[in-house]
């Protein structure tokens, strides 16, 4: 095949891709925390396990429930709702679970985070046009955006911030108690 023929073929395939305009679906989970519904890509999820009482951590804020052992690691477990709303934690039920999430930390200190769920998460495939921002400007620690997806209000968490908050709370660094201005 000549260089010109190869060039035309490449151009043609690029045009086809551009013309189709299809955006890829993102495989996500709708995650029912104790009071909120979260939307996260499945790639952030390591495993969902039955709820077990976390071992308390000294001087931890109320939203950091303690840590559980998972795959021979100590994983800090927190209540997302208590963190963002500044409230106490809610009661756990026999349906409660802990979702182990991959943290975004490059540190090996907290490679995973545990978040309390009221029930099992539900898979959902999402495209950009499926998500609508609600316009709720309420600022909360650990919240990237408040959205509506599949006729449900949900939160896209700020995983960087959550990792930072949990790491600091779990290992005694200076507490973070308010939003940056």
Where are these regions (language model features)?
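An acidic, low-aromatic, low-complexity terminal/linker signal
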Residues: 1-181
